[in-house]
Amino acid sequence: MINRDNKKAITKKGMISNRLNKFSIRKYTVGTASILVGTTLIFGLGNQEAKAAENTSTENAKQDEASASDNKEVVSETENNSTQKNDLTNPIKKETNTDSHQEAKEAPTTSSTQQQQNNATTSTETKPQNIEKENVKPSTDKTATEDTSVILEEKKAPNNTNNDVTTKPSTSEIQTTPTTPQESTNIENSQPQPTPSKVDNQVTDAINPKEPVNVSKEELKNNPEKLKELVRNDSNTDRSTKPVATAPTSVAPKRVNAKIRFAVAQPAAVASNNVNDLITVTKQMITEGIKDDGVIQAHDGEHIIYTSDFKIDNAVKAGDTMTVKYDKHTIPSDITDDFTPVDITDPSGEVIAKGTFDLNTKTITYKFTDYVDRYENVNAKLELNSYIDKKEVPNETNLNLTFATADKETSKNVKVEYQKPIVKDESNIQSIFSHLDTTKHEVEQTIYVNPLKLNAKNTNVTIKSGGVADNGDYYTGDGSTIIDSNTEIKVYKVASGQQLPQSNKIYDYSQYEDVTNSVTINKNYGTNMANINFGDIDSAYIVKVVSKYTPGAEDDLAVQQGVRMTTTNKYNYSSYAGYTNTILSTTDSGGGDGTVKPEEKLYKIGDYVWEDVDKDGVQGTDSKEKPMANVLVTLTYPDGTTKSVRTDANGHYEFGGLKDGETYTVKFETPAGYLPTKENGTTDGEKDSNGSSVTVKINGKDDMSLDTGFYKEPKYNLGDYVWEDTNKDGIQDANEPGIKDVKVTLKDSTGKVIGTTTTDASGKYKFTDLDNGNYTVEFETPAGYTPTVKNTTAEDKDSNGLTTTGVIKDADNWTLDSGFYKTPKYSLGDYVWYDSNKDGKQDSTEKGIKDVTVTLQNEKGEVIGTTKTDENGKYRFDNLDSGKYKVIFEKPAGLTQTGTNTTEDDKDADGGEVDVTITDHDDFTLDNGYFEEDTSDSDSDSDSDSDSDSDSDSDSDSDSDSDSDSDSDSDSDSDSDSDSDSDSDSDSDSDSDSDSDSDSDSDSDSDSDSDSDSDSDSDSDSDSDSDSDSDSDSDSDSDSDSDSDSDSDSDSDSDSDSDSDSDSDSDSDSDSDSDSDSDSDSDSDSDSDAGKHTPVKPMSATKDHHNKAKALPETGSENNGSNNATLFGGLFAALGSLLLFGRRKKQNK
């Protein structure tokens, strides 16, 4: 930091940690213009980085008339190009851009007004008074003559005074070339020139004020010249003898404190391994360097600060790497090409990691040193400064900035703003330092001339070493450049359709027209001055100036260069607009007289860790006490960063590089199996124990008294007994034995299993080598046992249950017992019987059913047993525990489940599946009953005639109706008819009558029909079929229908001697087949309708629609007269046909 009052710089001597030179380019504006600060850059030690800032200042200069008798003083501004500065190891470089414009007017000077034109800063205007015109385009008017031998008038102005300058137009001819600096050109000076209130663009390279300059005593002894440089005043000493104006302290360059910690490339001796996954970011943020308002003033040198706190895992080894990523719109340096990061170090200066920067990816790759092998639990901090990359951001815009440490990202939204030109009438200009080459000692300035493309008359641009205020006044500021015939000046014209980037930085000049040879350039316009005569212009131009500078001691920089645009306004007066750029690089020192600050002394702390066998907290009181190796000791610095070491074989540890007056914390990790001993056991600080954590402040000396002691933690036992509690009272009785092989589990207070064992032959168990604390003991219930009641008596005689808590407090615990008793077994079962009366109750006369399968399932549905009933219908399952079960009875073939739950539980039927719960008792109430369905016998004979029909029976399967046996009687009637058929056959049919007798059998005779039916006695019904015949009647209708067909044949039935056919009709009904019957008419009944009945089957399908027909008279003699039988048969057949056809028609519909 520059001492602004004495203009002297001092250096600090000693170790420098993570210091970077910073170069700021700034433009200061006092009045209407804003302060524009360029870039603050921080690089590795010895590397100089520039920070560009644009500063514009507007000043209202008051000028009063002065008498012609005023002394005329010609001042030539000279620059000491080899200024001497204090020896600064790490200079801070600041660049300041100052713009000014002023119009000279006649004698009575009015206060200049500030105007804004096209969103630009305006300056004051005064009438010209004997001031020489600079390179104005030739005119016929004598007042517009040009004087190329300009002699600058720079006056030192006292603070708080207004300076008035009176000038008169010169009537003499202007020389075409400048004379020596001492020549006068009619410049009258009535008062000191006003001190500009505007400050140049200044770039400040800020370094931590506490960091000393890296100059050793030996270096000073061996190099006296360096010592002389350190105590020698800056070139300000020379300047103090010159009548030049100095910038007021109010416009001095701003200093931006921007720390950055990064490092130089690591030698590739160790294999690289990216360990981003082992880096834990604990805190990171992005902040703005000047004002936290969401706006980055890029030309103000406002930097972006990225801070990151992170932990380095102990698994990280030397040679491993991590990455830090910049946002792609930012860059570490704004005006230099040196992007070398500095080391990441701890507060004592030890290097943790070194880094390299990749410009293409905007990424730093850090490689860890053996620091991570020597220390543990390393916490690090990273603070990076960056600036808007004008190549990526040529114009104002909104950005979302994203930075990342070890791929962990953080973001911030900002708006980027750039400077505006300084404007006075048609004069409008702006400039920046766009590049700094610290090797060649060159600086590049980019100037926008007439960026607003106004109609500017008699345009001249002057480039000057030193400062130019916004109003065009010249002043000596904070630095200088060398402008001579070797200075590179290029001029480019901007086409009407081209737009200048707002960043004021050109990366490709080839896109613009090179008009250098079309303008008049005078590089010797004055001492360290050049002038460009543009004439009348209405286009924008770019001027590129590359000038030399003289570095100070230790490469300090004080580079300042201003520009002024002069035009003739509509009143034929000159209007001025000025702009200044400055780079300052100085060391952060506290000011002073230039003497060397004593080297900062660093201190150490540490000492000893021992095993305190006698636990008294004092070292050496027991011969068995010894040092403890490998104990982890952690040092916490004032900024919160940490590092850890382990004690050596002698129990010793040490931390060095500590600063006086700062406070540190030391923590000792308690080794496994030990406890901290008593603290401060004696008044002797060298012999006591300081405990697990101690805070110490360095007071000008080392502190090697930070000791601590530990003693071995005693171990204890836990356990006792598992026994069979035969009387189930929960108390251990003398005659009750222990239970062997019971599993016991021990858990710590967090629930973690720390041991498992089993009881011995006596039921005893134990766990050993336990520390004080709370434990949980869990007993596993042995097979065939049940836990007894718990907590019934004294702790050492009761049962603690299946789970209990045991506490160890400086003693064994032998009270954790558990008791069990043998679990009783139970039985389940009972009886399956034949419920002959179907009432669902077990009667004394009803017998059991043998060989019924019974299955037992547990609560999960798993089969745990299967058995069959014995000859008495009894069954049972034994050896069952209390619980839920399901009993499943398999229904015997041919039997039907009887009604359930009709009476008392031990006498009723429980159904095919029964859920049962056993609770401490047997259950013999699980019974079930079945009965057999009624079946008709087959007198199969009876019909056997009608057997022929029987087929029809098969129709008659609907016989199953037959159950309505009784109907079947009516069938029998039909039989009787059929008998009549049987007539043809044989009276034996009439037997069938006897069938009819059997009718009671429900004629299952008709069974006889379809014996196939036979099972279906209901078949027998087939008579009932015959019912169904009665159905059949209706069927028979249908039959008869069918008959009817056949009947028409059937008539031939009549042939068929036997009505039986017609009867058989009833069979025949059994189906329209009967057609065929009729065919078969051949009475032989043999139509035994069996034939007919084949077709009958479809009819049987519809038979149940007619099973309500009237029954035929039960059997009778055939003496109704066979003579009439034929006639009636025919009639019935015809009627049946009609009905059948009608019915079919209906069905078809």
Swiss-Prot record:
Keyword Translocase part of the UniProt annotation: no
Motif position, LPXTG sorting signal: 1112-1116
Phenotypic consequence of E599D: In strain: 80s-2
GO BP of this protein: cell adhesion
Stretches with biased composition (Basic and acidic residues): 61-75, 92-106, 130-145, 216-241
InterPro entries for this protein: Adhesin_Fg-bd_dom_2, Adhesion_dom_sf, Fibrogen-bd_dom1, Ig-like_fold, LPXTG_anchor, SDr-like, Sdr_B, SDR_Ig
Record's compositionally biased regions (Polar residues): 77-89, 158-205
Domain CNA-B, chain residue ranges per copy: 602-714, 715-824, 825-935
One Pfam family linked to the record: Big_8
Membrane topology listed for this record: Peptidoglycan-anchor
Superkingdom field: Bacteria
Positions annotated as propeptide: 1116-1149
Pentaglycyl murein peptidoglycan amidated threonine, modified sites: T1115
Assigned keywords, A-Z: Cell wall, Peptidoglycan-anchor, Repeat, Secreted, Signal, Virulence
Effect of R876H: In strain: BM12987 / O24
Region Ligand binding A region, residue ranges: 53-601
Biased composition annotated in UniProt, kind: Low complexity: 109-126
GO cellular component terms given for this protein: extracellular region
Region Disordered: start-end pairs: 54-249, 675-697, 896-1124
Signal sequence, renumbered to the chain: 1-52
Annotated phenotype, changing D616V: In strain: BM12987 / O24
Regions of compositional bias (Acidic residues) in chain numbering: 903-913, 930-1088
Protein family per UniProt: Belongs to the serine-aspartate repeat-containing protein (SDr) family.
Task of the protein: Specifically interacts with bone sialoprotein (BSP), a glycoprotein of bone and dentin extracellular matrix. Could contribute to staphylococcal osteomyelitis and arthritis.
The protein, known as: Bone sialoprotein-binding protein
Source species: Staphylococcus aureus
Underlying gene: bbp
